[in-house]
Amino acid sequence: MLNILNQVKMKAIIFFCFLGLSFSAVGFAQSSDWMNLDTVKAGKYDTGKMWTFEYPPMDYFESTYHFRPDDDWFEHVRMSALRFANYCSASFVSEDGLVMTNHHCARQSVTQVTKEGEDLHSNGFIAQTLEDERPVPGLYVDQMVLFKDVTDEVVDAINKASNDEERAQFENDKIDEIEKRESEETGLKISITPLYNGGKYSLYGYKTYTDVRLVFAPEEKIAFFGGDPDNFTYPRYNLDCSFFRVYDENGKPLKTDNFFKWSENGASVGEPVFVVGNPGNTDRLNTVAQLEYARDIQYPRTLELLNSLIDINKQLLSDDPSKKLQLEDMIFMLENSKKSINGVLEGLRDPILMQRKKDFEKNFRSAVDADPELKAKYGQLWDKIADSRKKLSEISNKSFALSKNRFTTPQYFFVADEVIAIAENLKLPENERDDLYVGDELDNTLSSLYSPDYDAKKDQMLLEAKINVMIKYLGADDPLVKEFAGGKSGKEAVEYILDKSKITNVDDIKDLLAEGPDAVINSDDPFIKLMLNSKSKAKEYADKVKEITDVESSYSQQLGIALFDVYGTSIPPDATFTLRLADGVVEGFPYNGTYAQPFTTFYGLYDRYYGQGEKSPWDLPKRWENPPAGLDLSTPFNFVSTNDIIGGNSGSPVINKNAEIVGIAFDGNIQGLPGNFIFRTEENRTVSVHSNGMREVIEKVYKLKRLSDELKAGKITD
């Protein structure tokens, strides 16, 4: 699935997945044994087809599809598209604020609106009336209503810097200044996004809608039919759609002039189609040195972390089935991210694909070297970036081993930090202490060290995982590691540490503090000693990593300017979770020695259901086990097209030339695995739910005629 993130854990996943994408881990590497790699050349669209609304390729559209959309078309499409919270895409599909996105984008929302005694993931959610539509706390959608180029203003500020370190600071300061100014002037949510690694800067203004209510979500079994084994494959049979509604400030369905009408016939073979959405992140413009670092260090490390987190959450679910809703959401997200990262890694290890990247870099570098002015400004940037990656390779794993974050680090570490802070404050007169460490506030601080829902078993498993990371990247004989774990590893190390610790519960912490601040600072508690003894080293590593990456960011920004000078808008910028338009056609592809047809049907769904013995994850919800009378099994269900998508595109509308809905994108095929760094037109496909299939089942399986009628009419009809 294309969505890698749920709204609660977005920042945490970014931390360790480096914005993973959403493609599978199944092997696909091409054999290069028979090929002379020197003959491998970059493809015309290796950098993809995620076109910005600022720089649409009009001539290309006209020559390829005999279609030259005008400004009104682009504005209507832009205003009809939405960003779904901070992790998916969506769109308005009726004048009454009806919103369409994927079911897997709605998982967290479904969990949130589930009432006691309900199991909406298993049974689905159907709002038969407007009054039945359920508000989702905290959910919002963004509509991009403004964009403009602010490159000159930002670059002028950057150019005033006297060194590479200052460039990043000057860039951030100017962006903050412009965003604040424009936000005050427009009343919109303003965000400035670097494109082409800083070759261009675009300002986007969003209107945010915060009253969003769930209208329809199918059962998990049909939305994610085939489960993890079928994920990121094709043929597929998934009803991966859901519908919400935006309400206005008066609590009425929002009236909007901009929405996508529903196509009467849906997508057809060979038809040009456009995916309108917010692709999250790609690294297609990265240098070869940056990609090699990702291949050799970043992604292998991330996969190890994901594997440990998946194991932990599966064990927690096995131990406590009452936490099924929350833990299954987390496991789903982690496994999706694992497949994504593993898929990118497989691609990076493919010598043919890497040779295509090397050829692109060679051509780009040759173009720069051929222009004396460009060569003088930018000719050394590739070597400088390679040098920075070499330096980063020497310390990043060590920095990672000593780093802390709230998602993957055991709570014990943060408790130790807080106990140390309390002790240091207790040395001071009350009037000089931080407010958190005085009187009743101190009691509150102590009580909050371990929350009522604190899970000690989970923390112990996170501790074991952290010990393994420290041993791997710092070494078992490292003084910090040796002292902390007592020369032990795994569960033995956990037992050793917890037996010696005095901060695993609030009562013991109070007893320790009662001995005085010096007793805390000089304690032999393993957590306290580790936090004190590792502080300077962790800061040293973190500062060095920041220094290297800040300087490299400056190099990448300059390289982005060179890229734009050489190629202009003939190639699109990397994905930035901002609105893009990706063109393609409905088309199958060769696979497994045969050919994947562009469409699947409900006949195929039932063939898969019975062919797999009606067993999970190919079992069906009760209402689907026997097709209802009138359901046309020949109706197209899912389909593939040649559009370019990535994580963040989940929920993107697929439209035709008339800006009508013909589908909703939810996945990519296995050949799209390396899409993070290279787009392959030959077999890369977008997998979508067909518009005809959605309406057919909404009306005939779910008996939700009011929704089916609204999609057909483009407005509420009753």
List where the protein language model places each region.
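Terminal presequence/propeptide segments associated with secretion/organelle targeting
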Residues: 2, 9, 13, 28-718
